[in-house]
């Protein structure tokens, strides 16, 4: 069976990893993460259940998404802060600064 070249990436604030590997054609995004062995470098990483994406787009079903040559599978972490709440806080600060502080 033919092999394709893909990348698997994961980043923490203090450390990042980009792994290039060859996988059999027909490999899913989840399978590529498992084959990469990235869990060995990041012991707390749940490779079975973590959200995955390709080039910044979240995959609804990474177990079913078959990879193409050159694609980068991204492993996503949970958000530290709720984006809506951060925007509200930023708007409130800006409003109070406009009103004189």
UniProtKB/Swiss-Prot annotation:
Disulfide links within the chain: none
InterPro entries from the UniProt entry: Mopterin_synth/thiamin_S_b (IPR016155), RnfH (IPR005346), RnfH_sf (IPR037021)
Transmembrane segments annotated in the record for this chain: none
Similarity comment: Belongs to the UPF0125 (RnfH) family.
HAMAP family: UPF0125_RnfH
Protein name as catalogued: Protein RnfH
Species per Swiss-Prot/TrEMBL record: Pseudomonas aeruginosa (strain UCBPP-PA14)
